[in-house]
Regions:
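Conserved "right-hand" nucleotidyltransferase catalytic core of DNA-directed polymerases
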Residues: 2-76, 120, 137, 147-372, ...
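Acidic beta-strand-to-loop metal/phosphate-binding motif
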Residues: 32, 97-108, 390
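Short active-site loop/helix that positions an aromatic residue
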Residues: 39-42, 106-117, 130-133, 273-280, ...
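Nucleic-acid-processing active sites and adjacent nucleic-acid-binding tracks
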Residues: 65-100
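Conserved beta-strand -> loop -> alpha-helix junction used to position metal-binding or nucleic-acid-contacting
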Residues: 118-135, 142-144, 426-430
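Conserved pre-motif C helix in the palm subdomain of viral-like polymerases
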Residues: 188-195, 394, 546-566
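Active-site palm subdomain of RNA-directed nucleic acid polymerases
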Residues: 204-214, 560-583
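A common structural junction motif
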Residues: 482, 598-608
Length: 624
Protein backbone atom coordinates (compact mmCIF):
# COMPACT_ATOMS: atom_id res chain seq x y z
CA UNK A 1 0.00 0.00 0.00
CA UNK A 2 1.45 3.42 -1.01
CA UNK A 3 0.43 5.19 2.21
CA UNK A 4 3.19 3.52 4.23
CA UNK A 5 2.66 1.86 7.60
CA UNK A 6 -0.89 1.12 8.68
CA UNK A 7 -2.17 3.32 11.49
CA UNK A 8 -3.93 1.44 14.28
CA UNK A 9 -6.68 3.42 16.00
CA UNK A 10 -9.28 2.35 18.53
CA UNK A 11 -12.88 3.57 18.26
CA UNK A 12 -16.30 2.43 19.27
CA UNK A 13 -17.76 -0.03 16.77
CA UNK A 14 -19.38 1.60 13.75
CA UNK A 15 -22.77 0.59 12.35
CA UNK A 16 -21.25 0.52 8.86
CA UNK A 17 -19.82 -2.62 7.26
CA UNK A 18 -17.90 -3.14 4.04
CA UNK A 19 -20.09 -4.23 1.10
CA UNK A 20 -20.64 -7.98 0.74
CA UNK A 21 -20.49 -7.88 -3.05
CA UNK A 22 -19.37 -5.92 -6.08
CA UNK A 23 -22.89 -5.28 -7.31
CA UNK A 24 -23.56 -5.44 -11.04
CA UNK A 25 -24.76 -1.94 -12.03
CA UNK A 26 -24.88 -2.45 -15.79
CA UNK A 27 -28.69 -2.14 -15.94
CA UNK A 28 -28.86 1.26 -14.25
CA UNK A 29 -29.23 4.42 -16.31
CA UNK A 30 -27.73 6.74 -13.69
CA UNK A 31 -24.89 6.11 -11.23
CA UNK A 32 -23.68 8.62 -8.64
CA UNK A 33 -20.01 8.45 -7.66
CA UNK A 34 -18.03 10.05 -4.85
CA UNK A 35 -14.34 9.56 -4.11
CA UNK A 36 -12.42 9.79 -0.87
CA UNK A 37 -8.84 10.89 -1.43
CA UNK A 38 -5.52 11.65 0.13
CA UNK A 39 -4.98 15.01 -1.59
CA UNK A 40 -1.54 16.50 -1.03
CA UNK A 41 -2.31 19.25 -3.54
CA UNK A 42 -5.25 20.65 -1.60
CA UNK A 43 -3.52 20.08 1.72
CA UNK A 44 -0.61 22.23 0.54
CA UNK A 45 -2.85 24.91 -1.02
CA UNK A 46 -1.79 24.04 -4.55
CA UNK A 47 -5.25 23.12 -5.83
CA UNK A 48 -6.62 19.62 -6.35
CA UNK A 49 -3.69 17.21 -6.54
CA UNK A 50 -4.86 15.04 -9.43
CA UNK A 51 -3.33 17.26 -12.12
CA UNK A 52 0.05 17.58 -10.40
CA UNK A 53 0.55 14.00 -9.19
CA UNK A 54 0.13 14.81 -5.51
CA UNK A 55 -2.11 12.30 -3.73
CA UNK A 56 -4.27 9.29 -4.51
CA UNK A 57 -7.77 7.83 -4.28
CA UNK A 58 -8.38 5.85 -1.06
CA UNK A 59 -12.03 4.89 -1.47
CA UNK A 60 -14.85 4.72 -3.99
CA UNK A 61 -18.52 5.38 -3.11
CA UNK A 62 -21.33 4.62 -5.50
CA UNK A 63 -25.11 4.99 -5.38
CA UNK A 64 -27.95 3.91 -7.64
CA UNK A 65 -31.66 3.91 -6.98
CA UNK A 66 -32.23 1.68 -3.95
CA UNK A 67 -28.57 0.76 -3.28
CA UNK A 68 -25.30 2.35 -2.20
CA UNK A 69 -21.84 1.13 -1.23
CA UNK A 70 -18.40 2.36 -0.20
CA UNK A 71 -15.32 0.44 -1.29
CA UNK A 72 -12.23 1.49 0.72
CA UNK A 73 -8.77 0.40 -0.37
CA UNK A 74 -6.27 2.99 0.88
CA UNK A 75 -7.22 4.02 4.43
CA UNK A 76 -4.19 4.27 6.71
CA UNK A 77 -6.39 3.24 9.66
CA UNK A 78 -7.27 -0.08 8.04
CA UNK A 79 -10.53 -1.79 7.12
CA UNK A 80 -9.62 -1.85 3.45
CA UNK A 81 -10.83 -4.18 0.73
CA UNK A 82 -8.46 -5.73 -1.82
CA UNK A 83 -7.13 -2.74 -3.85
CA UNK A 84 -6.90 -4.60 -7.17
CA UNK A 85 -10.52 -5.74 -6.92
CA UNK A 86 -11.83 -2.27 -5.99
CA UNK A 87 -9.89 -0.61 -8.79
CA UNK A 88 -11.24 -3.12 -11.31
CA UNK A 89 -14.77 -2.44 -10.03
CA UNK A 90 -14.21 1.31 -10.35
CA UNK A 91 -12.94 0.84 -13.88
CA UNK A 92 -15.87 -1.40 -14.85
CA UNK A 93 -18.45 1.07 -13.51
CA UNK A 94 -16.80 4.07 -15.17
CA UNK A 95 -16.69 2.15 -18.48
CA UNK A 96 -20.49 1.75 -18.53
CA UNK A 97 -22.27 3.98 -21.08
CA UNK A 98 -24.82 5.28 -18.56
CA UNK A 99 -24.86 8.77 -16.99
CA UNK A 100 -22.34 9.32 -14.17
CA UNK A 101 -23.26 11.91 -11.54
CA UNK A 102 -20.75 13.74 -9.36
CA UNK A 103 -20.74 16.71 -7.04
CA UNK A 104 -17.75 18.74 -8.25
CA UNK A 105 -17.04 16.50 -11.21
CA UNK A 106 -13.80 18.23 -12.14
CA UNK A 107 -12.37 16.89 -8.89
CA UNK A 108 -13.64 13.31 -9.02
CA UNK A 109 -13.33 12.77 -12.78
CA UNK A 110 -9.89 14.37 -12.66
CA UNK A 111 -8.76 11.90 -9.99
CA UNK A 112 -10.27 8.93 -11.83
CA UNK A 113 -8.62 9.80 -15.13
CA UNK A 114 -5.30 10.59 -13.43
CA UNK A 115 -5.54 7.08 -11.95
CA UNK A 116 -5.96 5.52 -15.39
CA UNK A 117 -9.75 5.17 -15.16
CA UNK A 118 -11.53 6.98 -18.02
CA UNK A 119 -15.15 7.94 -17.41
CA UNK A 120 -17.51 6.98 -20.25
CA UNK A 121 -21.04 8.19 -20.87
CA UNK A 122 -22.58 11.58 -20.07
CA UNK A 123 -21.14 13.33 -16.99
CA UNK A 124 -23.42 15.32 -14.70
CA UNK A 125 -22.09 17.75 -12.10
CA UNK A 126 -24.69 18.69 -9.48
CA UNK A 127 -22.53 21.63 -8.39
CA UNK A 128 -22.66 23.10 -11.91
CA UNK A 129 -26.40 22.41 -12.10
CA UNK A 130 -26.90 24.19 -8.76
CA UNK A 131 -25.01 27.26 -9.99
CA UNK A 132 -27.16 27.43 -13.14
CA UNK A 133 -30.33 27.10 -11.08
CA UNK A 134 -29.22 29.81 -8.64
CA UNK A 135 -25.96 31.69 -9.23
CA UNK A 136 -26.34 33.82 -6.09
CA UNK A 137 -26.28 31.13 -3.39
CA UNK A 138 -24.02 31.51 -0.37
CA UNK A 139 -22.79 27.91 -0.59
CA UNK A 140 -22.70 25.14 -3.19
CA UNK A 141 -21.46 22.45 -0.83
CA UNK A 142 -23.21 19.09 -0.96
CA UNK A 143 -24.44 19.58 2.58
CA UNK A 144 -25.87 23.08 2.00
CA UNK A 145 -27.66 21.99 -1.18
CA UNK A 146 -29.02 18.83 0.46
CA UNK A 147 -30.47 20.86 3.32
CA UNK A 148 -32.13 23.38 0.99
CA UNK A 149 -33.37 21.08 -1.77
CA UNK A 150 -33.83 17.71 -0.03
CA UNK A 151 -34.33 18.71 3.59
CA UNK A 152 -31.57 16.24 4.47
CA UNK A 153 -28.33 16.80 6.33
CA UNK A 154 -25.09 14.85 6.04
CA UNK A 155 -24.44 12.57 9.01
CA UNK A 156 -20.93 13.62 10.03
CA UNK A 157 -21.13 13.10 13.81
CA UNK A 158 -19.34 9.75 13.94
CA UNK A 159 -16.73 10.93 11.46
CA UNK A 160 -15.98 14.09 13.46
CA UNK A 161 -15.91 12.25 16.80
CA UNK A 162 -13.47 9.66 15.47
CA UNK A 163 -11.27 12.36 13.94
CA UNK A 164 -11.31 14.50 17.10
CA UNK A 165 -10.38 11.54 19.31
CA UNK A 166 -7.08 11.15 17.48
CA UNK A 167 -6.34 14.72 16.43
CA UNK A 168 -7.14 14.18 12.77
CA UNK A 169 -8.70 16.77 10.45
CA UNK A 170 -12.03 15.12 9.45
CA UNK A 171 -11.78 16.36 5.87
CA UNK A 172 -8.11 16.79 4.94
CA UNK A 173 -6.97 13.66 6.80
CA UNK A 174 -10.01 11.44 6.43
CA UNK A 175 -7.81 8.87 4.69
CA UNK A 176 -6.02 8.23 8.00
CA UNK A 177 -9.18 6.95 9.70
CA UNK A 178 -10.33 3.31 9.65
CA UNK A 179 -12.70 2.80 6.74
CA UNK A 180 -15.55 1.86 9.10
CA UNK A 181 -15.77 5.46 10.33
CA UNK A 182 -15.83 6.88 6.80
CA UNK A 183 -18.07 4.34 5.06
CA UNK A 184 -21.48 5.70 5.99
CA UNK A 185 -20.40 9.28 5.33
CA UNK A 186 -19.00 8.38 1.88
CA UNK A 187 -22.06 6.33 0.89
CA UNK A 188 -24.32 9.18 1.90
CA UNK A 189 -22.34 11.64 -0.25
CA UNK A 190 -23.01 9.49 -3.31
CA UNK A 191 -26.66 8.97 -2.36
CA UNK A 192 -27.31 12.69 -1.80
CA UNK A 193 -25.64 13.50 -5.11
CA UNK A 194 -28.03 11.07 -6.85
CA UNK A 195 -31.04 12.59 -5.08
CA UNK A 196 -29.97 16.14 -5.88
CA UNK A 197 -29.78 15.30 -9.57
CA UNK A 198 -33.36 14.01 -9.55
CA UNK A 199 -34.44 17.37 -8.14
CA UNK A 200 -32.19 19.47 -10.35
CA UNK A 201 -33.40 17.73 -13.52
CA UNK A 202 -36.87 19.06 -12.76
CA UNK A 203 -35.54 22.54 -11.94
CA UNK A 204 -33.58 22.75 -15.18
CA UNK A 205 -36.69 21.83 -17.19
CA UNK A 206 -39.02 24.10 -15.19
CA UNK A 207 -36.68 27.10 -15.51
CA UNK A 208 -36.09 26.42 -19.25
CA UNK A 209 -32.34 26.04 -18.74
CA UNK A 210 -31.86 22.94 -20.90
CA UNK A 211 -29.92 24.65 -23.72
CA UNK A 212 -27.37 26.35 -21.49
CA UNK A 213 -27.17 23.28 -19.23
CA UNK A 214 -26.26 21.04 -22.18
CA UNK A 215 -23.55 23.48 -23.22
CA UNK A 216 -22.06 23.56 -19.70
CA UNK A 217 -22.31 19.76 -19.43
CA UNK A 218 -20.40 19.28 -22.70
CA UNK A 219 -17.76 21.82 -21.66
CA UNK A 220 -16.81 20.00 -18.46
CA UNK A 221 -14.57 17.26 -19.99
CA UNK A 222 -12.74 19.93 -22.00
CA UNK A 223 -11.86 21.90 -18.86
CA UNK A 224 -10.57 18.72 -17.21
CA UNK A 225 -8.33 18.00 -20.22
CA UNK A 226 -7.07 21.60 -20.24
CA UNK A 227 -6.00 21.41 -16.60
CA UNK A 228 -4.58 17.93 -17.01
CA UNK A 229 -2.27 19.06 -19.81
CA UNK A 230 -1.38 22.37 -18.19
CA UNK A 231 0.55 25.30 -19.63
CA UNK A 232 4.28 25.13 -20.31
CA UNK A 233 6.35 27.79 -18.55
CA UNK A 234 10.06 28.71 -18.71
CA UNK A 235 11.03 28.54 -15.04
CA UNK A 236 14.68 29.69 -15.30
CA UNK A 237 13.64 32.67 -17.37
CA UNK A 238 10.96 33.50 -14.77
CA UNK A 239 13.53 33.43 -11.95
CA UNK A 240 15.86 35.77 -13.84
CA UNK A 241 13.01 38.15 -14.65
CA UNK A 242 11.92 38.25 -11.01
CA UNK A 243 15.42 39.23 -9.89
CA UNK A 244 15.56 41.96 -12.55
CA UNK A 245 12.18 43.37 -11.50
CA UNK A 246 13.06 43.46 -7.80
CA UNK A 247 16.12 45.56 -8.63
CA UNK A 248 14.03 47.91 -10.78
CA UNK A 249 11.49 48.32 -7.98
CA UNK A 250 14.22 49.39 -5.55
CA UNK A 251 15.39 52.04 -8.02
CA UNK A 252 11.83 53.38 -8.35
CA UNK A 253 11.37 53.55 -4.57
CA UNK A 254 14.61 55.55 -4.31
CA UNK A 255 13.31 57.93 -7.00
CA UNK A 256 10.01 58.38 -5.10
CA UNK A 257 11.92 59.23 -1.91
CA UNK A 258 14.13 61.68 -3.79
CA UNK A 259 11.10 63.36 -5.37
CA UNK A 260 9.01 63.62 -2.17
CA UNK A 261 11.66 63.75 0.52
CA UNK A 262 10.09 60.88 2.48
CA UNK A 263 9.82 57.10 2.25
CA UNK A 264 6.43 56.09 0.86
CA UNK A 265 4.50 52.82 1.14
CA UNK A 266 3.16 52.75 -2.41
CA UNK A 267 0.08 50.74 -1.38
CA UNK A 268 -0.93 52.98 1.58
CA UNK A 269 -3.13 55.92 0.54
CA UNK A 270 -2.44 57.85 3.75
CA UNK A 271 1.32 57.65 3.21
CA UNK A 272 0.98 58.72 -0.41
CA UNK A 273 -1.18 61.62 0.82
CA UNK A 274 1.66 62.76 3.12
CA UNK A 275 3.98 62.92 0.13
CA UNK A 276 1.40 64.85 -1.92
CA UNK A 277 0.75 67.22 1.00
CA UNK A 278 4.46 67.89 1.37
CA UNK A 279 4.67 68.66 -2.33
CA UNK A 280 1.45 70.75 -2.15
CA UNK A 281 -0.33 68.58 -4.72
CA UNK A 282 -4.11 68.03 -4.81
CA UNK A 283 -5.67 64.55 -4.66
CA UNK A 284 -9.19 63.05 -4.37
CA UNK A 285 -10.86 61.78 -1.22
CA UNK A 286 -13.61 59.20 -0.77
CA UNK A 287 -17.10 60.66 -0.76
CA UNK A 288 -18.24 58.98 2.45
CA UNK A 289 -15.21 58.93 4.80
CA UNK A 290 -13.14 61.71 3.17
CA UNK A 291 -10.09 59.44 3.31
CA UNK A 292 -7.38 59.95 0.64
CA UNK A 293 -8.13 57.92 -2.50
CA UNK A 294 -5.37 57.02 -4.96
CA UNK A 295 -6.89 54.64 -7.47
CA UNK A 296 -4.74 53.28 -10.26
CA UNK A 297 -6.78 55.14 -12.89
CA UNK A 298 -6.43 58.45 -11.09
CA UNK A 299 -2.68 58.02 -10.68
CA UNK A 300 -2.28 57.02 -14.34
CA UNK A 301 -4.13 60.16 -15.48
CA UNK A 302 -2.19 62.43 -13.09
CA UNK A 303 0.76 64.03 -14.91
CA UNK A 304 2.88 64.75 -11.81
CA UNK A 305 6.15 62.84 -11.77
CA UNK A 306 5.57 61.26 -8.34
CA UNK A 307 2.20 59.86 -9.47
CA UNK A 308 3.85 58.23 -12.48
CA UNK A 309 6.66 56.83 -10.31
CA UNK A 310 4.10 55.31 -7.92
CA UNK A 311 2.21 53.77 -10.86
CA UNK A 312 5.41 52.20 -12.16
CA UNK A 313 6.48 50.97 -8.72
CA UNK A 314 3.05 49.47 -8.03
CA UNK A 315 3.00 47.71 -11.37
CA UNK A 316 6.45 46.21 -11.04
CA UNK A 317 5.73 45.17 -7.43
CA UNK A 318 2.59 43.40 -8.57
CA UNK A 319 4.36 41.77 -11.49
CA UNK A 320 7.10 40.14 -9.45
CA UNK A 321 5.18 39.74 -6.19
CA UNK A 322 1.99 38.31 -7.62
CA UNK A 323 2.55 36.89 -11.10
CA UNK A 324 6.13 35.66 -10.97
CA UNK A 325 5.85 34.35 -7.40
CA UNK A 326 2.76 32.39 -8.47
CA UNK A 327 4.65 30.85 -11.38
CA UNK A 328 7.39 29.64 -9.02
CA UNK A 329 4.91 28.32 -6.47
CA UNK A 330 2.58 26.44 -8.80
CA UNK A 331 4.83 25.13 -11.57
CA UNK A 332 5.39 21.38 -11.59
CA UNK A 333 8.01 20.05 -14.00
CA UNK A 334 7.79 23.20 -16.09
CA UNK A 335 3.99 23.26 -16.32
CA UNK A 336 1.24 25.13 -14.51
CA UNK A 337 -2.01 23.25 -13.98
CA UNK A 338 -4.32 26.06 -12.88
CA UNK A 339 -7.83 25.21 -11.68
CA UNK A 340 -10.62 26.39 -13.98
CA UNK A 341 -13.82 27.52 -12.30
CA UNK A 342 -16.67 26.76 -14.68
CA UNK A 343 -19.40 28.54 -12.71
CA UNK A 344 -19.92 29.78 -9.15
CA UNK A 345 -18.74 27.43 -6.42
CA UNK A 346 -17.42 27.58 -2.87
CA UNK A 347 -13.85 28.04 -4.11
CA UNK A 348 -14.43 30.76 -6.69
CA UNK A 349 -16.18 31.31 -9.99
CA UNK A 350 -18.35 34.06 -11.44
CA UNK A 351 -22.08 34.81 -11.38
CA UNK A 352 -21.92 35.85 -15.05
CA UNK A 353 -21.01 32.41 -16.41
CA UNK A 354 -17.54 33.47 -17.50
CA UNK A 355 -14.69 31.10 -16.69
CA UNK A 356 -12.26 32.08 -13.96
CA UNK A 357 -9.02 30.54 -12.71
CA UNK A 358 -7.38 29.87 -9.37
CA UNK A 359 -4.26 28.17 -8.02
CA UNK A 360 -2.93 30.25 -9.76
CA UNK A 361 -5.14 32.85 -11.41
CA UNK A 362 -3.58 33.05 -14.86
CA UNK A 363 -6.27 35.52 -15.92
CA UNK A 364 -4.39 38.13 -13.88
CA UNK A 365 -1.29 37.83 -16.05
CA UNK A 366 -0.87 41.40 -17.36
CA UNK A 367 -1.60 42.36 -20.94
CA UNK A 368 -1.77 46.16 -21.03
CA UNK A 369 1.63 47.10 -19.64
CA UNK A 370 3.82 47.50 -22.72
CA UNK A 371 7.09 46.90 -20.87
CA UNK A 372 6.41 44.03 -18.50
CA UNK A 373 3.21 42.47 -19.86
CA UNK A 374 4.93 40.88 -22.89
CA UNK A 375 7.92 39.84 -20.74
CA UNK A 376 5.71 37.89 -18.32
CA UNK A 377 3.56 36.46 -21.10
CA UNK A 378 6.68 35.38 -22.97
CA UNK A 379 7.38 32.91 -20.15
CA UNK A 380 4.44 30.79 -21.38
CA UNK A 381 5.24 28.64 -24.40
CA UNK A 382 3.43 26.14 -26.68
CA UNK A 383 4.10 22.44 -27.09
CA UNK A 384 7.17 21.43 -29.12
CA UNK A 385 6.62 21.79 -32.85
CA UNK A 386 3.83 24.37 -32.44
CA UNK A 387 3.43 28.12 -32.22
CA UNK A 388 1.43 29.90 -29.55
CA UNK A 389 -1.82 31.18 -31.02
CA UNK A 390 -3.79 33.94 -29.28
CA UNK A 391 -7.32 34.41 -30.64
CA UNK A 392 -9.14 37.47 -29.37
CA UNK A 393 -12.77 38.54 -29.76
CA UNK A 394 -12.51 42.11 -31.00
CA UNK A 395 -14.81 44.44 -29.01
CA UNK A 396 -16.90 41.54 -27.77
CA UNK A 397 -18.90 43.55 -25.22
CA UNK A 398 -19.68 46.61 -27.40
CA UNK A 399 -20.83 44.28 -30.19
CA UNK A 400 -23.17 42.52 -27.75
CA UNK A 401 -24.52 45.91 -26.62
CA UNK A 402 -25.27 46.96 -30.19
CA UNK A 403 -26.92 43.58 -30.90
CA UNK A 404 -29.33 43.86 -27.97
CA UNK A 405 -30.07 47.56 -28.59
CA UNK A 406 -30.93 46.77 -32.22
CA UNK A 407 -33.05 43.76 -31.21
CA UNK A 408 -35.68 45.68 -29.23
CA UNK A 409 -38.55 46.62 -31.53
CA UNK A 410 -37.09 48.26 -34.61
CA UNK A 411 -33.96 49.09 -32.68
CA UNK A 412 -33.10 51.93 -30.32
CA UNK A 413 -32.03 55.20 -31.92
CA UNK A 414 -28.52 54.94 -33.33
CA UNK A 415 -28.17 51.18 -32.89
CA UNK A 416 -29.03 50.18 -36.46
CA UNK A 417 -26.39 52.58 -37.78
CA UNK A 418 -23.82 50.81 -35.60
CA UNK A 419 -25.07 47.42 -36.86
CA UNK A 420 -24.38 48.65 -40.40
CA UNK A 421 -21.00 50.04 -39.39
CA UNK A 422 -20.07 46.69 -37.89
CA UNK A 423 -20.60 44.97 -41.24
CA UNK A 424 -17.15 46.41 -41.93
CA UNK A 425 -14.85 44.10 -39.99
CA UNK A 426 -12.51 47.01 -39.21
CA UNK A 427 -15.21 49.08 -37.45
CA UNK A 428 -14.22 50.41 -34.03
CA UNK A 429 -17.18 51.06 -31.71
CA UNK A 430 -15.30 53.33 -29.32
CA UNK A 431 -13.68 55.38 -32.12
CA UNK A 432 -17.02 55.74 -33.93
CA UNK A 433 -18.64 56.94 -30.70
CA UNK A 434 -15.69 59.24 -29.93
CA UNK A 435 -16.08 60.88 -33.35
CA UNK A 436 -19.83 61.31 -32.82
CA UNK A 437 -19.44 62.81 -29.34
CA UNK A 438 -16.30 64.80 -30.08
CA UNK A 439 -14.13 63.27 -27.35
CA UNK A 440 -11.00 61.11 -27.20
CA UNK A 441 -11.33 57.38 -27.85
CA UNK A 442 -10.04 56.52 -24.37
CA UNK A 443 -12.75 58.70 -22.84
CA UNK A 444 -15.43 57.18 -25.08
CA UNK A 445 -14.30 53.68 -24.08
CA UNK A 446 -14.25 54.50 -20.35
CA UNK A 447 -17.72 56.09 -20.48
CA UNK A 448 -19.20 53.33 -22.66
CA UNK A 449 -17.89 50.52 -20.48
CA UNK A 450 -18.85 52.50 -17.37
CA UNK A 451 -22.46 52.72 -18.59
CA UNK A 452 -22.46 49.03 -19.48
CA UNK A 453 -21.11 48.16 -16.02
CA UNK A 454 -23.53 50.44 -14.16
CA UNK A 455 -20.67 52.59 -12.87
CA UNK A 456 -21.65 55.62 -10.74
CA UNK A 457 -20.66 59.19 -11.66
CA UNK A 458 -18.11 59.49 -8.86
CA UNK A 459 -16.34 56.29 -9.88
CA UNK A 460 -16.50 57.29 -13.54
CA UNK A 461 -15.01 60.70 -12.71
CA UNK A 462 -12.08 59.04 -10.94
CA UNK A 463 -11.60 56.63 -13.87
CA UNK A 464 -11.59 59.54 -16.33
CA UNK A 465 -9.33 61.65 -14.11
CA UNK A 466 -11.81 64.57 -14.12
CA UNK A 467 -14.17 66.24 -11.64
CA UNK A 468 -17.63 64.85 -10.95
CA UNK A 469 -19.24 67.80 -12.78
CA UNK A 470 -17.00 67.29 -15.82
CA UNK A 471 -17.82 63.58 -15.82
CA UNK A 472 -21.53 64.38 -15.68
CA UNK A 473 -21.21 66.71 -18.69
CA UNK A 474 -19.37 64.03 -20.66
CA UNK A 475 -22.06 61.43 -19.82
CA UNK A 476 -24.85 63.81 -20.93
CA UNK A 477 -22.97 64.49 -24.16
CA UNK A 478 -22.39 60.76 -24.71
CA UNK A 479 -26.03 59.82 -24.11
CA UNK A 480 -27.24 62.58 -26.44
CA UNK A 481 -25.12 61.34 -29.35
CA UNK A 482 -25.33 57.60 -28.51
CA UNK A 483 -28.73 57.26 -26.81
CA UNK A 484 -29.15 53.51 -27.26
CA UNK A 485 -26.64 52.54 -24.54
CA UNK A 486 -28.56 54.33 -21.77
CA UNK A 487 -31.92 53.22 -23.20
CA UNK A 488 -30.79 49.61 -23.22
CA UNK A 489 -29.40 49.96 -19.70
CA UNK A 490 -32.73 51.41 -18.51
CA UNK A 491 -34.66 48.65 -20.27
CA UNK A 492 -32.55 45.93 -18.62
CA UNK A 493 -32.91 47.58 -15.23
CA UNK A 494 -36.69 47.79 -15.67
CA UNK A 495 -36.89 44.09 -16.63
CA UNK A 496 -34.76 43.14 -13.62
CA UNK A 497 -36.89 45.31 -11.31
CA UNK A 498 -40.15 43.86 -12.60
CA UNK A 499 -39.30 40.19 -13.10
CA UNK A 500 -36.17 39.71 -11.03
CA UNK A 501 -34.42 38.00 -13.94
CA UNK A 502 -33.03 38.60 -17.41
CA UNK A 503 -31.78 35.97 -19.87
CA UNK A 504 -28.77 35.73 -22.13
CA UNK A 505 -28.80 34.54 -25.73
CA UNK A 506 -28.36 30.90 -24.61
CA UNK A 507 -31.04 31.21 -21.94
CA UNK A 508 -28.68 31.65 -18.97
CA UNK A 509 -30.55 33.34 -16.13
CA UNK A 510 -29.20 36.47 -14.43
CA UNK A 511 -31.20 36.75 -11.22
CA UNK A 512 -31.84 39.72 -8.93
CA UNK A 513 -33.21 38.09 -5.79
CA UNK A 514 -31.91 40.47 -3.12
CA UNK A 515 -33.92 43.43 -1.81
CA UNK A 516 -33.25 46.79 -0.16
CA UNK A 517 -35.22 49.76 1.14
CA UNK A 518 -36.39 52.48 -1.24
CA UNK A 519 -34.99 55.09 1.14
CA UNK A 520 -32.03 57.07 -0.19
CA UNK A 521 -28.55 56.04 0.95
CA UNK A 522 -26.35 52.97 1.22
CA UNK A 523 -28.16 49.85 2.45
CA UNK A 524 -27.39 46.18 2.94
CA UNK A 525 -29.20 43.96 0.43
CA UNK A 526 -31.26 41.21 2.07
CA UNK A 527 -33.53 38.29 1.26
CA UNK A 528 -37.13 39.23 0.49
CA UNK A 529 -38.54 37.98 3.81
CA UNK A 530 -35.92 39.84 5.85
CA UNK A 531 -36.34 43.06 3.86
CA UNK A 532 -40.15 42.95 4.23
CA UNK A 533 -39.84 42.39 7.98
CA UNK A 534 -37.44 45.31 8.35
CA UNK A 535 -38.87 47.91 5.94
CA UNK A 536 -42.38 46.78 4.97
CA UNK A 537 -43.59 45.30 1.68
CA UNK A 538 -44.30 48.66 0.03
CA UNK A 539 -40.96 50.23 0.91
CA UNK A 540 -38.55 47.79 -0.73
CA UNK A 541 -37.07 47.31 -4.20
CA UNK A 542 -34.80 44.77 -5.86
CA UNK A 543 -31.11 45.42 -5.25
CA UNK A 544 -28.30 45.70 -7.82
CA UNK A 545 -30.61 46.05 -10.83
CA UNK A 546 -28.38 48.88 -12.10
CA UNK A 547 -26.00 46.05 -13.04
CA UNK A 548 -28.57 44.35 -15.29
CA UNK A 549 -27.06 45.44 -18.62
CA UNK A 550 -23.61 44.35 -17.48
CA UNK A 551 -24.97 40.97 -16.40
CA UNK A 552 -26.66 40.54 -19.79
CA UNK A 553 -23.51 41.45 -21.73
CA UNK A 554 -21.13 39.42 -19.55
CA UNK A 555 -23.45 36.41 -19.57
CA UNK A 556 -23.87 36.52 -23.35
CA UNK A 557 -20.11 36.89 -23.80
CA UNK A 558 -19.67 33.82 -21.60
CA UNK A 559 -22.14 31.92 -23.79
CA UNK A 560 -20.26 32.90 -26.93
CA UNK A 561 -16.82 32.00 -25.57
CA UNK A 562 -17.93 28.68 -24.11
CA UNK A 563 -19.72 27.66 -27.30
CA UNK A 564 -16.55 28.56 -29.22
CA UNK A 565 -14.52 26.27 -26.98
CA UNK A 566 -16.95 23.43 -27.68
CA UNK A 567 -16.91 24.02 -31.43
CA UNK A 568 -13.12 24.22 -31.52
CA UNK A 569 -12.70 21.07 -29.44
CA UNK A 570 -15.10 19.14 -31.67
CA UNK A 571 -12.85 20.18 -34.56
CA UNK A 572 -9.77 18.84 -32.77
CA UNK A 573 -8.48 22.03 -31.13
CA UNK A 574 -8.04 21.89 -27.33
CA UNK A 575 -7.46 25.37 -25.83
CA UNK A 576 -4.38 26.03 -23.73
CA UNK A 577 -6.00 28.92 -21.86
CA UNK A 578 -9.14 31.03 -21.82
CA UNK A 579 -8.43 34.58 -20.65
CA UNK A 580 -11.25 37.16 -20.72
CA UNK A 581 -12.07 37.60 -24.45
CA UNK A 582 -9.11 35.49 -25.56
CA UNK A 583 -8.58 31.81 -26.35
CA UNK A 584 -5.06 30.40 -26.72
CA UNK A 585 -4.14 27.28 -28.72
CA UNK A 586 -1.15 25.27 -29.92
CA UNK A 587 -1.06 26.15 -33.62
CA UNK A 588 0.90 24.43 -36.40
CA UNK A 589 0.79 27.16 -39.05
CA UNK A 590 -1.31 29.91 -40.65
CA UNK A 591 -3.68 27.38 -42.23
CA UNK A 592 -4.34 25.83 -38.82
CA UNK A 593 -4.86 29.30 -37.32
CA UNK A 594 -7.42 30.20 -39.99
CA UNK A 595 -9.39 27.04 -39.16
CA UNK A 596 -9.59 28.03 -35.48
CA UNK A 597 -10.48 31.62 -36.37
CA UNK A 598 -13.32 30.45 -38.59
CA UNK A 599 -14.68 28.15 -35.86
CA UNK A 600 -14.64 30.96 -33.30
CA UNK A 601 -16.15 33.60 -35.57
CA UNK A 602 -19.87 33.01 -35.11
CA UNK A 603 -20.70 30.16 -32.72
CA UNK A 604 -23.91 32.00 -31.79
CA UNK A 605 -25.82 34.19 -34.22
CA UNK A 606 -25.99 37.91 -33.40
CA UNK A 607 -27.11 40.92 -35.45
CA UNK A 608 -23.53 42.14 -35.30
CA UNK A 609 -20.87 39.84 -36.79
CA UNK A 610 -18.13 38.71 -34.44
CA UNK A 611 -14.55 39.43 -35.37
CA UNK A 612 -11.73 37.21 -34.13
CA UNK A 613 -8.21 38.56 -34.42
CA UNK A 614 -5.24 36.30 -33.89
CA UNK A 615 -1.49 36.38 -33.50
CA UNK A 616 1.13 33.62 -33.63
CA UNK A 617 4.48 33.50 -31.88
CA UNK A 618 7.10 31.43 -30.11
CA UNK A 619 5.45 32.35 -26.79
CA UNK A 620 2.30 34.00 -25.46
CA UNK A 621 4.12 37.33 -25.32
CA UNK A 622 5.27 37.02 -28.94
CA UNK A 623 1.86 36.07 -30.36
CA UNK A 624 1.09 39.08 -32.56
Amino acid sequence: MSNGLQLTLTFKKSMWNTPMEYKDLSQYKEIAIDLETKDDGLNNKLGAGWAIGKGEIVGFAVAVEGWKGYFPFGHLGGGNMIPEQVKKYMKDICALPCTKIFHNAQYDVGWLEASGIPVHGPIVDTMIAAALIDENRFSYSLNALSVDYLNEIKAETELREAAAAHGIDPKAEMWKLPAEHVGYYAEQDAELTLKLWQRFKQEIATQSLTTVWEMEQQLLPILIKMRQRGVRVQVEKAEALQKEMKNQEQELLKAIKKESGIEVDIWASRQIAKAFDKMKLDYPRTEKTKEPSFTQNWLINNKNKIAQLIVSAREINKFHGTFLSSIMKYQVNGRIHGEINQLRGDNGGTVSGRLSMSNPNLQQVPARNKDFGPKIRSLFIPEDGYKWGSFDYSQQEPRMTVHYAASIGEGYEGSNELVQAYQNSQADFHQTVADLVGIERTQAKTIGLGLMYGMGKQKLAISLGVSKDEANELIIKYNKKVPFVKKLSDRCKYAADEKGVIRTKKGRKCRFDMWETRDFGLHVAEKYEDAVAKYGKDNIKRAFTYKALNRLIQGSSADQTKQSMLDCYEDGHLPILQIHDELCFNVKDEKHAKQIQKKMQNPIEFKVPSVVEYGLGESWGDAK
